[in-house]
């Protein structure tokens, strides 16, 4: 019999009347079960968090930081245990899964330290007008209250920690909703917060079926801030339900790699492979299309093809480069994009092959803009090459996307690269490197349908706080 995992609510581990069974994407074996919470149980989570918030916010930054450092230490101690489960639950290579836990600990430690650098300021009215020269404003940051943190399946631990730690150090309380496929990993993360001894109600978890509690947890007026990573469709729905409440949304992307004539093609190919096929392409920041100058396209395509053929294919426990996708629905969607490109004349340079949820890495050359693969986000191991004849054409295609997360430019002409970067409608541009999240002290954001708000530890703390100004007159 597999393990029944529990939610952590108000300092206690709790089961629910109903449960959700979690299966491994690679083998189909049952990994365990998590509680399927009811709306009444959600009410209790939120009430517990609200009750705990005044005492938590009254602690100093240094006191809250001490709790977070304990959490990070526990995660480092248990990284192999958590990584082993994470690897099975989301079909991620074991080494990558352990690295995710380590990175989460690093983010939590950094957030604890960054909180100590959050300072207020004093403003003088005389800077605006002489009549107000005796007015002084003391400006401080205060927590928003209860933060609902919702993490995605592809990084259920890391993209939870990047939300939770900045919120907690700022004096907020947390209701953490892990993804259904990733819930067990999320509850293992919760064990670290529980063991660290945070006061009851400060950190809580919610697991359950989206059809039953998905809208309820977002619409609930106890929630003061919603921090979500996931699909654009769900993100847009959350935005509408949030109303006047602040939100942070990290959504989809169609990141372009623009390759100019003077690029180091070996470096370019290496980065494109890592960017496109890491975790089987199931990353919002994955390289999802290559826009290459026709004059160097043949040479680059051959280099990429050689590296695609060298990728290992198999199961997560083997640390294969390409592992099964998260579920059948996702694999079906990727297969649909592949078939559309193939039917419309794109040149498949590797074998088109699928076994269950496992899709072998596919490289398409001569993809055109009438193909779905040129525009839609596959979230799978398929990479389209689009040949262009000018920088202007590459910029135009890149900017026509409904998404605006990131882009890469490969060139040895850095002034030219900066000029192109200014024209790209994305949150981040990488020069001579793959698109990727991080480092986590950098701002991370998306334009258009790729998100709302700015992440990165300092920016996340600022987002999940509000400014209060206290004004008085000097006599």
UniProtKB/Swiss-Prot annotation:
EC code: 1.2.1.9
Reactions catalysed according to its record: D-glyceraldehyde 3-phosphate + NADP(+) + H2O = (2R)-3-phosphoglycerate + NADPH + 2 H(+)
Binding-site residues, substrate: 103, 154-155, 283-285, 437
Location of the active site: 250, 284
InterPro entries per the UniProt record, alphabetical: Ald_DH/histidinol_DH (IPR016161), Ald_DH_C (IPR016163), Ald_DH_CS_CYS (IPR016160), Ald_DH_N (IPR016162), Aldehyde_DH_dom (IPR015590), ALDH-related_metabolic_enz (IPR051020)
SUPFAM superfamilies membership: ALDH-like
Quaternary structure, from the entry: Homotetramer.
UniProt-recorded name of the protein: NADP-dependent glyceraldehyde-3-phosphate dehydrogenase
Originating organism: Streptococcus mutans serotype c (strain ATCC 700610 / UA159)
Lineage: Bacteria, Bacillati, Bacillota, Bacilli, Lactobacillales
Name of the gene: gapN
